[in-house]
Design a protein with these regions (language model features):
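Extreme N-terminal tail/first-helix region
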Residues: 1-28
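Short, contiguous alpha-helical
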Residues: 9-10, 46-92, 119, 130-171
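Short coil/turn segments at secondary-structure junctions
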Residues: 10-18, 95-105, 145
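Hydrophobic packing residues in well-ordered alpha-helices of helical domains and bundles
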Residues: 19, 23-26, 56, 104-111, ...
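Acidic/histidine-rich alpha-helical segments that form the ligand environment
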Residues: 25-30, 36, 94-131
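A glycine-rich, hydrophobic loop/mini-helix early in the fold
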Residues: 28-31, 35, 39-50
Length: 171
């Protein structure tokens, strides 16, 4: 019995530290983008380093679209009991918006507002709230995800794009 209790305590601690790490990454991303872009003008932020590469503006517009699409999925997991959610492609979603035409700072401002709201909602969740789940359809049949797995997905995705943003603005 003591081994099982120790394992449960260890799992809860690991779960809590993963949640803290995800919340830190999610809350820091907009600030990191602002620091990376500090002192650059719109022309620099809209410049593509080469024909097939995204500009800084396109990267942030993509992150904003992902945050909106995936953030809505998280909101549904929190507010509904195990919903079935049809997968929405952020790349398809962005084509329905004017995000790619907006100036960089407006896109970053809107992304930052969305992110602040998501982080606020996530911080209010009890530990068990992070395990709320949904079944996703549309790309793979019946794939399940949790609030934590989706929040982690967003954070990991953004880390890769922050590296891309740094490379883009160095070239």
């Amino acid at each position: 019995m003591k081994k099982r209790e120790a394992k449960r305590a260890s799992d809860a601690h690991a779960h809590a530290s993963e949640i803290r790490a995800v919340l830190t990454l999610l809350s820091e991303t907009p600030k990191t983008i602002a620091r990376i872009a500090q002192g650059l003008d719109e022309q620099q932020l809209h410049r593509q380093p080469d024909v097939d590469a995204w500009s800084a503006q396109e990267i942030v517009a993509h992150l904003r679209a992902c945050a909106e699409v995936w953030g809505r999925s998280i909101d549904r997991m929190v507010t509904e009991d195990h919903p079935t959610i049809r997968y929405v492609s952020p790349r398809g979603w962005i084509r329905k918006t004017d995000y790619l035409q907006q100036d960089f700072r407006e896109t970053l401002r809107k992304f930052s507002e969305q992110r602040a709201g998501l982080v606020t909602r996530l911080r209010k969740l009890p530990a068990r709230g992070w395990t709320r789940s949904a079944t996703f359809t549309g790309t793979t049949s019946g794939r399940d995800g949790t609030v934590l797995s989706y929040a982690n997905r967003i954070a990991e995705h953004e880390v890769r794009h922050l590296d891309q943003l740094r490379r883009t603005l160095k070239s």
